[in-house]
Amino acid sequence: MTSSKKLVLVSAAILIDEQQNILLAQRPKGKPQEGLWEFPGGKIEPGESPEKALTRELFEELNIITQEKDLSPFTFISEDCERFHLLMPLYIIKKWKGTIEGKEGQEFRWIRASELDSYPMPKPDLPLIPKLKALLQSD
């Protein structure tokens, strides 16, 4: 059975600092699902690799420079959403250059994996919470 839903390709990062904190960004006002917390990233443009898209998006959104060689594949999300089907590879990144700032006016927070349940997130991100807790063996 084929679906008439559009396939949306997104690439996202789980940024982890030296203290094993995870960066969450809040979706800005005026964007779909505004106010929810998510892992930074964005849409993959035609002809662009997921890694190239992610390095571009992290610079555009957070003003940090990442190298494709420093992206470690973690998992992916394949989610049938209301109006589209989401396919999103996620990468763990522990190395970047620059100071993180929300260039689109979004708020961001460094949190422990044990705190992930306290932040409202888009439905496709929810299955990542236990995986991240297990990875970081948080609290």
Predicted segment positions?
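Conserved N-terminal beta-strand and adjoining loop/helix that marks the start
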Residues: 1-22, 43, 76
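Generic C-terminal helix-cap and adjacent flexible tail
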Residues: 2-5, 133-139
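Active-site-adjacent beta-strand/loop module that shapes the phosphate/pyrophosphate-binding cleft
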Residues: 8, 17, 75-99, 109
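Conserved Nudix-box catalytic region and its N-terminal flanking loop in Nudix hydrolases
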Residues: 21-60
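A short coil-to-beta-strand element that immediately follows conserved catalytic motifs
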Residues: 65-75
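NUDIX/MutT-family hydrolases
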Residues: 90-92, 100-132
